[in-house]
């Protein structure tokens, strides 16, 4: 195992703010095993994503901000993000530990300003997200599709601003067609982070899951009896009872909400701990730790 080469208390070294999934992918693809960055989640405002180069790919791990001001990744909880990073310095996510943060400026222009000046410039950038398609009416216009992110360069008129897109093209845009995005400070406190993100929402099912040391649940059995192995969905329906309430992020359309006592028909048991199931016609993913397998043929054994 390579030794970690970063200070987890230096937030500016590993926290990249509202970086999109695609930009994180670009920064980390082909980089050394264990290179990583932490960014704001564009799916659930207030949460974070740990993006890591591992096993010739880039993995993205969701970090949930809990109401008690703690942070959760997989089945592990931490008091703060530096503690989380310290843990994964010596524990594998999937095939790697965290070794070093990705460079904040992977491709600085040759002979241009230094990184400290770039940092100041980046902090002063103003971003907007496009609300509608705009084909452009004149040669000086900047066409865009709904959902793009643009950098504002100049505001020569009240209703028309000059902007640059991700490809570097510059042109005029109609102000009523966009909304401003307020950049959150990378040094701000957890409770004061801005809910906006510069990234386009990414599907929740695209997140990876770190290795877990939590044992898989087993079918409940009578005292003194042998514990039965986890049943297979190939042998017929498997049922579980929700033992913990689950209220998913409103933006996560793949997650299954649970109330304590709900009977879940388990349709698939993924090895990463995210199971698939159905409750009253609603289908989705849920953590196996939120349910307890039971045998509907022997209800007295399930108490």
From Swiss-Prot:
May mediate the transduction of intracellular signals. It holds the Pfam family SH2. It comes from Rattus norvegicus. It comes from the Eukaryota. GO terms for biological process: acetylcholine receptor signaling pathway; animal organ morphogenesis; anterior/posterior pattern specification; B cell apoptotic process; blood vessel development; cell chemotaxis; cell migration; cellular response to interleukin-7. This is Crk-like protein. Interacts with INPP5D/SHIP1. Interacts with DOCK2 and EPOR. Interacts with phosphorylated CBLB and IRS4. Interacts with BCAR1/CAS and NEDD9/HEF1. InterPro entries: CRK_SH3_C, CRK_SH3_N, SH2, SH2_dom_sf, SH3-like_dom_sf, SH3_domain, Tyrosine-phos_adapter. SMART domains: SH2 (SM00252), SH3 (SM00326).
């Amino acid at each position: 195992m390579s030794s970690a080469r970063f200070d987890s208390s230096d937030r500016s070294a590993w926290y990249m703010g509202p970086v999109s999934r695609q930009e994180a992918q670009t920064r980390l693809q082909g980089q050394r095993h264990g290179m990583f960055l932490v960014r704001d989640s564009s799916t659930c405002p207030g949460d974070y994503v740990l993006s890591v180069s591992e096993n010739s790919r880039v993995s993205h791990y969701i970090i949930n901000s809990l109401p008690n001001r703690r942070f959760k990744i997989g089945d592990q909880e931490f008091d703060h993000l530096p503690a989380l990073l310290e843990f994964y310095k010596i524990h594998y996510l999937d095939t790697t530990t965290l070794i070093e943060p990705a460079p904040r400026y992977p491709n600085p222009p040759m002979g241009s300003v230094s990184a400290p000046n770039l940092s100041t410039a980046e902090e002063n950038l103003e971003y907007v997200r496009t609300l509608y398609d705009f084909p452009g009416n004149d040669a000086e216009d900047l066409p865009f599709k709904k959902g793009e992110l643009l950098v504002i360069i100049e505001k020569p008129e009240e209703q028309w601003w000059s902007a640059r897109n991700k490809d570097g093209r510059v042109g005029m845009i109609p102000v009523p067609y966009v909304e401003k995005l307020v950049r959150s400070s990378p040094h701000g406190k957890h409770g004061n982070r801005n809910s906006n993100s510069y990234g386009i929402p990414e599907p929740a099912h695209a997140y990876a899951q770190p290795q877990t040391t939590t044992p898989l649940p087993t079918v409940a059995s009578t005292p003194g009896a042998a514990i039965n192995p986890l049943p297979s969905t190939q042998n017929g329906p498997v049922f579980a009872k929700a033992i913990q309430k689950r209220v998913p992020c409103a933006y996560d359309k793949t997650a299954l909400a649970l109330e304590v006592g709900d009977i879940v028909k388990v349709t698939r048991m993924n090895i990463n701990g995210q199971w698939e199931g159905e409750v009253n016609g609603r289908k989705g993913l849920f953590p196996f730790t939120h349910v307890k397998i039971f045998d509907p043929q022997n209800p007295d054994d399930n108490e």
